[in-house]
């Protein structure tokens, strides 16, 4: 069973090459797909320098949609979602994330960046706040448990947690040490970064009520995937 790494990227020209270097040289990764979500910088040009499949959406559709496009093109049953704004990615990180799923010990393994023993304990042991990491490995069947309505924008990570457990699949969390991440305020400027963070937090907060309290997904009707124009480079 092979593993496809999928990067949903929006204007990640500063860090994407380092992430791709790690993925394309790893023996644990069999295929890499980059989905540029309407990037306006050199994200697509950088991706095309590597032996990967590059899908360039002509407009921005949100992270969940870009991930969905990547899954549609993936050749393998193990999916490794990776953020394009990370740095210091090593093969040890990749192996720690892929191995539990590839070895049959978990159906979804979520990578949590180390933030110190206290914060790690509060987050993972005391469950103070949802696990919303964009770095995760899963079987394709776990991805397919998520209703279409949640495969958009910032909803997808919280929805994956909910439906992985609800469907009886096994979720594992793995703390990843020495993995860097470029924060929104650094990429987009203070004001735009804070606004983007607020938008994401508000969307996730309302989503959690929907997923766990109102459960509107129980009577939701499957939706067709919206059609988007894109350029494909293989």
Predicted regions span which residues?
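Short beta-strand-to-loop element that shapes/binds the nucleotide-sugar donor at the catalytic cleft/hinge
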Residues: 109-123
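A conserved acidic beta->alpha catalytic loop
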Residues: 36-44
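Hydrophobic helical membrane-anchoring modules
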Residues: 151, 158, 165-234
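Conserved donor-nucleotide/metal-binding helix-loop-beta segment in metal-dependent transferases, i.e.
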Residues: 91-110
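Cell-envelope/extracellular polymer assembly enzymes that use nucleotide-activated donors
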Residues: 2-4, 159
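Short aromatic/hydrophobic "clamp" motif used to bind/position activated sugar donors
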Residues: 79
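Glycine-rich, basic loop-to-helix element that forms the pyrophosphate-binding segment
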Residues: 57-74
